[in-house]
Structures are given as structure tokens and as C-alpha cells.
Amino acid sequence: MFAKTYHATHPDMMFAVSNDDLRDRYLMQGLFQDGQIVLTYNHAERFVVGGVVATSPIKLPDQTEPASAAGHPFLERRELGVINVGDTTGKITVDGVAYEIVPRDGLYVTMGAKDVTFEGVDGAARFYLVSLPAHAAFETKKLAFADAIPLERGALETSNERTIYQYIVPTTCKSAQLLLGMTVLKPGSVWNTMPPHLHDRRSEAYFYFGLGENDRVFHYMGEPDEMRHIVIANEEAVMSPPWSIHMGSGTANYTFIWAMGGENLDYTDMNVLDICQLK
């Protein structure tokens, strides 16, 4: 069912880790394959991160393990966030109710939904997926890009002018633990999440897209005084454990989707660091 499983890690495991091992532990590649749903399982907060390329209707699979859950709906005890990251309109049908999802629109699907199907409307549709365990059911809700809460941050002079769009936060869409949004860097800006921060009570996944074929993002992670980096290409994701900073710089401006899960739903629950603390 899952293309790869990522285990939770301790900061001590960063000591002397090779570049290949670092990528193997945190980088999620190959999420978008024609006609497939690709899902990865992360033990950090039990995150599921994945991608869909709907060349024809594709159903979210049922659970396959453990044996006691085999055949049960994927969202029996989970909630799901979806954003259309392609250039064509798609459609998501949840228990018989269809939602048209244009590029940059999203959908929150509540725990307990039984049948979720993805398809294209005017060509193959590309959807990015994140799912977390849920303890309560809420309302399945379309998340229009036009309705997302924009937060303007940074400045062109510091190469980090960006707009943060909040899709799933308590003021716009109720969820059990999932927070979801998208950050768009302005032309001439390349730094995200600057200055960086920590949130010890939450894990976070970053999904980078909108990059050219020859562009890359250098994603920085690790403890503030023991930083490492992972070079990331278009449509790749990275998991940030609670003890790790997370920020990036690109060879050009780009867009990334952030998804968080953990103990609370307070977007501002973070420990902002001074850039001089980094090593």
C-alpha cells in the first residue's frame, strides 16, 4: 500500500550521517506517477504523504494492514488534505458528492469518508495529498485558493518576500490535527521560513513545486547548531521532525505546501530563532 515507510529519528542520528542516508531518511521522491496514487508512511505523527496523477478515475485505496483493518476505508480513522498542484482542473468525489478542484484549490476530507475518487476534467489532474490520524469527524469542505487567508511576509530586499496562504487552520476549516497551507515566493525572492523556527509539539512536511527542470531548493534541517541540507528538485517533499529547523533557499522563486500535525492547532505555536544561533 505504501511505496516507502520513514521511521521517526532522534537528533543523535544526524551525527556523521552520509548524504545518501540523510536523503533516504527524510526525502520523498517519485510521488507523481501517471495513472497512480503513490503514498508514503511516516512514523512522525503517522503522516501519510502522497501524490495522484489522475489520467482516469482513481480511488483512494482501502487499508491493507494490519489484518484486522484490511478492507476498511483508508479514512476510517484519518483525515485528508488535498491541493491541486497541476495546471488542469480536477474533480474529487467523496461518498457521491463531487467537488471541482481548479489549480491551487484544495479539499479537506473528514474522518469516516468511505469512497474518495480522483479524476481529471480537462486532462490529467495532479493532486498532492497529506493525511493524519483523527479523533473526531468534521465537515468535508472545498478549500478555494481565493478564500485562503493570505499573510504577507518578508521583503524583496532580504530575498524572502512571500505570501503564506492558510487553507486548513481553525478559523477557516475545522480539523482534528491537520494544518495545511501554501507559501508562494515572489520573483526575486528565494528564502523561505526566514528566520527559521522550531515547534517541538508538531512535525511538518514540506512539498516543493513550481521549480524549473534545472532549478533546485536547498532545504536546511537539523538542530540549530548542527545544520545539514538536502538538495530538492521539483515535486519532491521532505519531512521535518519536531526537533529540526526547516527553511530553504532556491536557485529561483518557487512554491511549497506545508502540512503540520501534532499536539495542537495553534499556527503560531513556534519558537522563532535568531539567525545568529545557526551553525
UniProtKB/Swiss-Prot annotation:
One Pfam annotation reads KduI
Reactions catalysed, semicolon-separated, are: 5-dehydro-4-deoxy-D-glucuronate = 3-deoxy-D-glycero-2,5-hexodiulosonate
Biological process (GO) annotations?
D-galacturonate catabolic process; D-glucuronate catabolic process; pectin catabolic process
UniProt pathway: Glycan metabolism; pectin degradation; 2-dehydro-3-deoxy-D-gluconate from pectin: step 4/5
Q: Which CDD domains match?
A: cupin_KduI_C (cd20491), cupin_KduI_N (cd20294)
- What Gene3D superfamilies does the database record attribute to this sequence? Jelly Rolls, pectin degrading enzyme 5-keto 4- deoxyuronate isomerase, domain 1
Q: Report the cofactors.
A: Zn(2+)
Keywords, A to Z? Isomerase, Metal-binding, Zinc
Provide any one GO MF term from the record. Answer: 4-deoxy-L-threo-5-hexosulose-uronate ketol-isomerase activity
Asked whether the keyword Metal-binding is assigned, the reply is yes
| Cofactor, free-text remark | Binds 1 zinc ion per subunit.
Q: Highest taxon of the source?
A: Bacteria
Q: Tell me which EC number(s) this protein carries.
A: 5.3.1.17
Q: Which SUPFAM superfamilies match?
A: RmlC-like cupins
User: Where does the chain bind Zn(2+)?
Assistant: H197, H199, E204, H246
InterPro entries tied to this protein: KduI, KduI/IolB_isomerase, KduI_N, RmlC-like_jellyroll, RmlC_Cupin_sf
Function recorded in the entry = Catalyzes the isomerization of 5-dehydro-4-deoxy-D-glucuronate to 3-deoxy-D-glycero-2,5-hexodiulosonate.
PANTHER family cross-referenced by the UniProt entry: 4-DEOXY-L-THREO-5-HEXOSULOSE-URONATE KETOL-ISOMERASE
* Similarity comment text for this entry: Belongs to the KduI family.
* Protein name in the entry: 4-deoxy-L-threo-5-hexosulose-uronate ketol-isomerase
Taxonomic placement: Bacteria, Pseudomonadati, Pseudomonadota, Alphaproteobacteria, Caulobacterales
Its gene? kduI
